Amino acid sequence: MRSLTLILGLLAGVLLANPPSSTMKVVFSDDFNGDALDETKWTYDGNKECISLKGGKLIISLKQRPDGWQGSAVSTRNKFTQVQGYFEASIRYNGNKGHHGAFVVKNLEKTEPPAAALYYECFGEDKLVPWARLADNRGVRDVHPPKNGLNLTPGLVTKKFNTYGILWNDRGFAWYFNDRQILKMDKLDVKEPMLLHLGNWVSDFEVKDLVASKLPDDVEVDWVKIYK
């Protein structure tokens, strides 16, 4: 059985090894310094009205519609994918409950098993959850770390930008926070390329906790880099 192994707490201990990017080359990047989203790099995976650029940052907002609250996302779908490598972004996550920010490295939805989706999700109030959804000949299953989250200093991921990274190599998958490896998973024989997805979503299970008076509560992305 494949499992996620917690390497260290975000504020406890230091991994002395260099980050994966130190031995790789950048093959995709965006610093969001333009006037509009660069559609040669990104595909809208939701409502375009929720996506904007401001002050050199990608802003992913929520929008109220007659049928409820709607989030959105952008991804490199149909623009950039690769087999293995290191996917990295500088993100400030949402501060409140009722919706969740997402940094995801995944295969296309119609990819035949084995396939994977590797997540960093923040459910507000500094609840950051790294996890994986795997598909193989045994079916689809979700794999979560112990306690289904990480112990964080209040405001660490919701008031500051931090660097989130996901590594995919021959040995498996690993999650990095500010260049420190915090989680790893042993090998799944995924062969198809993966894309990068950045989102701010409202799911049915959490919408009851969404408080309109606390909006806007955007997810902001300062930059993205993908290495090979």
Enumerate the language-model features and the residues they cover.
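Bacterial N-terminal signal peptides
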Residues: 5-14
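GH16 jelly-roll
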Residues: 18-228
